[in-house]
């Protein structure tokens, strides 16, 4: 047995058995593409578990993270974006990140990079429409950026995110208070100011953050619901703030 990432992989004696048991949907052509992209000359089944202590576990760890652990459609969707971006066009992924590939310049292989970006753009559009509905292109982009910035603050600056969340709840409890949320400014990272009595917040972040973050996931969908639930005549008079 092989233990990786605090998970015991049962009956895994080689990379080949790992593919057949832990990576559903991976067949021979996919394995050959990996071997070609990462320039592995030896077959995967030659690396046994007993030799993995001396062998670099990066390759196996890479597969274990990107492939889903079951046949759930949500895990499969999460893996599709990785397979489309790395497996199908590893060179394009390197060029997109501004990194050289096999000694080439970053400006080369433009056609494959263009095709890869088209596939990724269509994939993102489909996912955004599933989350936010059939909104226009600009609204989709704004919603996606607002959700991303809100999640970024929650994951990296949780104390500031919680302070903004408490400030929002405190403001909404007041009577005759209209809470304005500027989605355009939030999508550009212009988040305003915190209260001067904020504790545990640096001066730099006080100038960047107010009640524009601190929301639950999907807050933009609820915020835009009123805009797209009215008639066309009234909709023309409304605008995102």
UniProtKB/Swiss-Prot annotation:
The keyword Transmembrane does not apply. GO terms for biological process: translation. Signal peptide: none annotated. It comes from the Eukaryota. Keywords: Mitochondrion, Ribonucleoprotein, Ribosomal protein. It is found in: Mitochondrion. GO terms for cellular component: mitochondrion; ribonucleoprotein complex; ribosome. PROSITE patterns: RIBOSOMAL_S13_1, RIBOSOMAL_S13_2. GO terms for molecular function: RNA binding; structural constituent of ribosome. The keyword Transcription regulation does not apply. Its main location: mitochondrion. Belongs to the universal ribosomal protein uS13 family. This is Small ribosomal subunit protein uS13m. It comes from Paramecium tetraurelia.
